[in-house]
Curated annotation (Swiss-Prot):
Keywords: Membrane, Mitochondrion, Mitochondrion inner membrane, Transmembrane, Transmembrane helix
Compartment(s) where it occurs, according to its Swiss-Prot or TrEMBL record: Mitochondrion inner membrane
Upper taxonomic lineage: Eukaryota, Viridiplantae, Streptophyta, Embryophyta, Tracheophyta
Assigned protein family: Belongs to the cytochrome c oxidase subunit 5C family.
Function text: This protein is one of the nuclear-coded polypeptide chains of cytochrome c oxidase, the terminal oxidase in mitochondrial electron transport.
Protein name according to UniProt: Cytochrome c oxidase subunit 5C
Keyword Mitochondrion set for record: yes
Highest rank taxon of the organism: Eukaryota
Transmembrane residue ranges: 15-30
């Protein structure tokens, strides 16, 4: 499911991609 979500984000707008990356980094840091 993670791969599919990442693929969808990759195809989406750059803004969405940035939000996804920020969320992932936040979870990793948290």
């Amino acid at each position: 499911a993670g791969x599919x979500x990442a693929h969808x984000x990759y195809k989406g707008p750059s803004v969405v991609k940035e939000l996804v990356i920020x969320x992932x980094l936040g979870l990793x840091a948290g």
